[in-house]
A protein has these predicted regions:
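Membrane-interface helix-loop-helix modules in multi-pass membrane proteins
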Residues: 52-111, 122-126, 142-157, 342-367, ...
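Extracellular loop-to-transmembrane helix junctions
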Residues: 2-19, 77-108, 117, 160-172, ...
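Loop-to-transmembrane helix boundary motifs in multi-pass membrane proteins
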Residues: 123-141, 344-354, 427-429, 447-455, ...
Length: 631
């Protein structure tokens, strides 16, 4: 019952926040005007600038910002206990994350769809524009390298997810043509597409799991370079190139719209399963996981400040400012839709993060299992206790996925930690959510095999929408940097997209911690702090926008301070901690990147301090229209 109560209270909190704080921001602070000219109308080109109904743009925006962030982050953070993670998700999303996304969207809408980095040049100063865009470029390169790897790993771990994810692409193209070329109604094709997606999940689970390990794995120079992860990464980047250069209505919008329906249905099933499991007493949060963990292993970073960079999406994420000001602002057809899209989508993501926390604690406590078999003949066998030969549940089940101070004896009689923070890799945390969510779905009578397929497709679909949106965003950033540096070839959308993906592929396909194709994991430790630093810098732009328009700034200024201090603190700990710091463990590449990111932050803050004195009430006019139009 405690699991259900926490879920219900969290969801009620989000609903109340939307209709109170969100509405106050929309009316009193940003003054949204349904009659105002928006970029999608003023710069309409049917490629990037496309006026779009709010239901469709909400689907694109939500699925793009969600990705695997609100899954992996909370799945890791419950290591410190479910209560700190829950508080940061609920309070962070209401007062920081949703304000950040909403503010970035409005600022971009009022500046002809320019990115937050471009707007920084006018609100703070020309150097601030270049600094912000450079941080965006670094962050998006890491996102592309990591998310390509994430999807490839999911396809590798869960072959049953592959068919449904790829079936979605031709469905999206058909729906895009139906809506934008023929003006057809969107309801019926959406329902049909949703049905086909779930049929494909069943086919993938029971008949046709697509496992490329049966095909690829060619050894070259003593290493298996053409492994499953490498092949899927290459295929995904080719897809991203095509999706990024096509008009948004052709593939990006309809795919995200289909995704949003599929994902919302999956989330509703999870909530129903959670409710049934909670009411029947099978899902017991407090019996499964500690509210605040007391047996933290020595290799774990401190909860303060690392909680704030571990859970990004689901509370606040700098990547969201790129989506708000990169793709969404170019498609919103009325200012009055901005609260629904910007503030509302972030609260829904917070709801997803709450479900993840409960799935990784109470859901895992319902039982854990191992995958046995290959091809379509695989099954899931429960892990049993050695003494009683009965399936482990509650805390005994939870510690199989979140081992903390499990010890082993060395040859000399001393002990060492087995598990701990080092064991919390990407696979383990994705599996924790998939397994816990599968248990919730099983409470509804859905077979575990089908439930796991639904959960795996959920994760892969979120990550895929983020990947293709991030590719388009990186193209915008490269375009703006190229304009600033007068590099004309990179202002071409095909060349800019190819440059973005070749660079990301070069990182992703390197020999990394998990072998060929895991190079993105090398830069993974940078992502958390760099991503959250972007949120702090985006808040700085929002603050200056409001300051120059003589608006109250406290509601954005306080989050700005938090999101500038916490990521910097975490980054410095990662760089200089005597036991684990990059400087002292020989991770000089990470240390070098850390120095660059911290230097950029300090420089950006200095630019803000310089501009502050003359900013209030001094709002700069927009540049001539032709200088803003994209290639």
């Amino acid at each position: 019952m405690n699991t259900l109560i926490i879920a219900v209270l969290s969801f009620i909190g989000f609903i109340v926040a939307y209709h109170t704080y969100g509405k106050w921001l929309a009316r009193k602070i940003f003054g949204l005007d349904a009659q105002a000219t928006v970029p999608s109308q003023e710069l309409k080109d049917d490629v990037d600038y496309v006026p779009t109904k709010k239901e469709i743009i909400f689907g694109h925006h939500f699925t793009s910002i969600a990705g695997t962030g609100p899954i992996v982050g909370p799945a890791i953070a419950v290591f410190w206990g479910w209560l700190p993670a829950l508080l940061w998700v609920v309070l962070g999303s209401v007062f920081i994350g949703a304000v950040h996304d909403f503010g970035a969207l409005v600022v971009s809408l009022r500046n002809r769809g320019q990115s937050v980095g471009e707007v920084a040049g006018r609100m703070i100063g020309p150097r601030a524009k270049f600094l912000f865009l450079f941080v965006l470029f670094i962050g998006l390169t890491i996102v592309l390298a990591i998310f390509g790897l994430v999807i490839a790993l999911i396809f590798s771990y869960y072959p049953e997810s592959v068919l449904s994810v790829w079936v979605e692409i031709p469905l999206a193209v058909v729906i895009g043509l139906w809506i934008y070329r023929r003006g057809g109604n969107i309801l019926i094709p959406s329902i049909v597409a949703l049905g086909i997606m779930y049929i494909a999940m069943g086919v993938g689970a029971y008949l046709l799991p697509i496992d490329l390990s049966q095909i690829f794995g060619i050894p070259l120079l003593g290493q298996t370079y053409l492994n499953v992860v490498v092949v899927w990464t290459l295929v995904l980047f080719v897809y991203c190139f095509i999706a990024s250069v096509l008009p948004v209505w052709t593939l990006l919008q309809p795919r995200d719209f289909i995704n949003s329906h599929e994902l919302v249905l999956a989330l509703l099933l999870l909530v129903l399963g959670l409710a049934v499991a909670g009411l029947t007493g099978r899902a017991d949060l407090t019996a499964s996981a500690p509210a605040i963990a007391s047996d933290i292993p020595p290799d774990a970073p401190p909860i303060w400040p690392f909680l704030f960079i571990t859970i990004a999406c689901g509370a606040v994420s700098g990547f969201h400012c790129m989506v708000s000001s990169g793709t969404s602002s170019k498609q919103v057809e009325s200012e009055s839709d901005a609260q629904y899209v910007g503030y509302g989508a972030m609260l829904l993501e917070g709801g997803l993060a709450v479900i993840v926390i409960l799935a990784c604690c109470a859901g895992i406590g319902m039982g854990v299992f191992n995958r046995v078999g290959t091809g379509a003949n695989y099954t899931f066998e429960p892990i049993v206790a050695a003494e009683s030969a009965t399936p482990v549940t509650n805390h005994d089940a939870w510690i199989t996925r979140y081992a903390t101070t499990t010890t082993a004896t060395n040859a000399d009689g001393t002990t060492r930690v087995v598990g701990g923070w080092a064991s919390h890799n990407l696979k383990a945390k994705v599996s924790a959510f998939v397994d816990g969510g599968g248990n919730f779905l099983a409470s509804l009578g859905i077979p575990l095999k089908m439930g796991i397929a639904i959960m795996a497709v959920l994760v892969a679909s979120f990550a895929a929408t983020t990947l293709d949106t991030a590719t388009r965003l990186q193209r915008y950033v490269i375009f703006e940097l190229a304009q600033t540096a007068n590099i004309k070839p990179l202002t071409n959308r095909y060349i800019a997209t190819a440059f973005a993906l070749v660079l990301a592929a070069a990182v992703a396909l390197l020999q990394g911690p998990s072998g060929p194709g895991s190079g993105g994991l090398t830069l993974w430790p940078l992502f958390g702090a760099t991503n959250q630093l972007l949120a702090g810098l985006a808040f700085m732009v929002i603050v200056f926008y409001l300051l120059r328009r003589n608006k109250p700034i406290w509601f954005a200024f306080l989050p700005m301070v938090v999101m500038l201090i916490m990521p910097a603190w975490a980054m410095l700990h990662q760089m200089f901690d005597p036991q684990t710091g990059w400087l002292f463990t020989g991770k000089y590449l990470l240390f070098g990147f850390g120095v660059v990111v911290e230097a950029l932050q300090i420089w950006m803050i200095a630019e803000g301090v310089i501009a502050w004195r003359n900013a209030r009430g001094n709002y700069p006019e927009l540049p001539p229209l032709e200088s803003v139009a994209a290639d």
